[in-house]
Amino acid sequence: MEGKNTSITFDGREIRLTTGLYAPQAGGAVMIECGDTSLLVTATKTTKKQAADFLPLICDYEEKLYAAGRIPGGFMRREGRPPERATLIARLIDRPMRPLFPSWMRDEIQIVASCLSLDERVPADVLGVTGASIATLLAEIPFYGPMAAVRVGLIGDDFILNPSYREIEKGDLDIVVAGSPEGIVMIEAGANQLSEQDTIEAIDFGYEAVSELIKAQENLLKDLGIKQVKPLEPEEDKALATYLEKNCTKPIDLILKKFDQSKEERDLELDKIELEVQTKIDSLKDDNQLKVLTSENEKLIHSDFKKLTKKLMRSQIINEGKRVDGRDLDEVRKISASAGILPKRVHGSALFQRGLTQVLSTTTLGTPSDAQEMDDLNPSTEKTYLHHYNFPPYSVGETRPMRTPGRREIGHGALAERAITPVLPGKETFPYVLRVVSEVLSSNGSTSMGSVCGSTLSLLDAGVPLKAPVSGTAMGLIKEGKEVRILTDIQGIEDFLGDMDFKVAGTEKGITALQMDMKITGLPVSVISDAIKKARPARLHILEKMQEAIDKPQESLSPHAPRLLSFRIDPELIGTVIGPGGRTIKGITERTNTKIDIEDGGIVTIASHDGAAAEEAQKIIEGLTRKVHEGEIFPGVVTRIIPIGAFVEILPGKEGMVHISQLSEARVERVEDVVRQGDEVTVRVREIDSRGRINLTLRGVAQNGGMSYPEPTPTPVAPLN
């Protein structure tokens, strides 16, 4: 078997491409490699057309643990349902590819990216996006490409192209920029409160690199002798479109200008007009051109009616500067926010509403053992902040089965999670595991940004000391020729009929998350820059409204939340606390009814619903790890009697032995003649032997006083009730 090997030198690295060797029955296939990361990306188109009004595109990303030299856990030792990470990468591939296929295409297309080997220095996701473009070009599928993606990081003042996982963690920015020859088509970013200007410069830096990869793909096609298939729109019978334009333009236009109408009223009136048109056409003679045309395609009337509505709405925005609800282009919908709306058995709760979009967010405080273990190719082994987003059918007035979260719900949850993560307190300050759930109760655009706002409010209500509150808004765009209008806080119909959905989240200081999706084939950086700048006053306005509901963390936690104490011990003494076979730590947890977690670095976290019990456990652990020195005097309690002496607890959990010869200046025949179990005595540390055993004495020690137990200084991370 022979294939063609080519390479691209990019940012000082070699990207290796192998074509014509793998997956010979796929429409197009490429093995794309950089470092030790290898992905096989395929693109296949069927000739079977779907009777749908959308492009039936499926993008899948598969990663098997053998790519990192690991065997899956679980009884079956086999990969199961794709992890969340795989779903997010599949979406990352889908989002820049979808707008580059012609809107009229109805052929089934499937792109599959399989990670066969993973190098931690070379993340697989952006390679998969670029590989999807190459595979599609090789399959000769009509496509407004080439398209490519790069990741940009920021360490200090320097932008880094395609940083490693470690560099991403160290830096203040993680942004993926995807683009076509016409401009940027997708952005996905997380940032540490980065300024708008720095963010714009990062996008510009990324698109310059994208342009290099686009040229490299064009050269690859020339080398392989493949001519790119440019989309050629098929001729359609315009009779129905002409009929609708003549008969429906005026009534639709009147509806779109009823600015005081609710969404429901507007939708009902538009549906009524569409139904009247359907009835008129159905009443025509069987040989009428319109009836023949619509009988062959039952969805044609709905599709063309939607196109006309879209055209009129866009024209109103471009020519009159007015939106369907009467707002100006830069106006935010009415906002209401409230915190603490549920009983305190829910640790934190909030309700955020913007227009008809309403989100209920809840926060649960968990212990370190509640962290999510990651069994995928992500170098991180656990997550301590989880955001789950739910979109039930009733939120849009529909009915459908409620099953497991779909790709959209996973993606929106990840976006909200990314927006909040930079402002979370450090684990030494607040070592709780946090789970936020955002329930979309009503949807009319920008529910993910509603989730960001609701999350901030519920976290503050739970008493989480955020570094700063976060708000978010969705920006839209209408582009007709050279005319461009940017919309602030888009609602559902503007998202559906517009050209861009650009979500911007951040604090007063700067941006924490971006997500931009397009329905056109690209936008210049200048337009993206304008949208980012216009989002700032909207974000700050929303933030002001949120702070009217709650502007700082609650001073006390819910009485039903666990209480945590966090402190540090010498890592070399972790074994002392755990004890042989875990007996010591098990004894402490059983005695105090607490949960104890110890990290390799020596950070101990004690969880309990009883603050006094947590303090008792801390005293025991600090007693076990406190270094005892010869000559120190301690008050103690006799815990055991043996023939040759008595054991005395001098610190919580730490015992020493008084040999029978050290019980008194005089000769002692029986230990019980001097002390009994439970007696309080004062002892001096006589010696610590080579095995670390503490030998004590009562000789020469006054028994009417002495040192008291040393009181450890607790470092509580939450108020103790």
Swiss-Prot record:
Transmembrane segments: none annotated. SMART domains: KH, S1. It is found in: Cytoplasm. Keywords: Cytoplasm, Magnesium, Metal-binding, Nucleotidyltransferase, RNA-binding, Transferase. One of its GO terms (cellular component) is cytosol. The keyword Mitochondrion does not apply. Its EC number is 2.7.7.8. GO terms for molecular function: 3'-5'-RNA exonuclease activity; magnesium ion binding; polyribonucleotide nucleotidyltransferase activity; RNA binding. Residues 631-699 form the S1 motif domain. The keyword Metal-binding applies. It holds the Pfam family PNPase. Mg(2+) binds at residues 495, 501. SUPFAM superfamilies: Eukaryotic type KH-domain (KH-domain type I), Nucleic acid-binding proteins, Ribonuclease PH domain 2-like, Ribosomal protein S5 domain 2-like. Involved in mRNA degradation. Catalyzes the phosphorolysis of single-stranded polyribonucleotides processively in the 3'- to 5'-direction. This is Polyribonucleotide nucleotidyltransferase. It comes from Prochlorococcus marinus subsp. pastoris (strain CCMP1986 / NIES-2087 / MED4). The lineage of its organism: Bacteria, Bacillati, Cyanobacteriota, Cyanophyceae, Synechococcales.
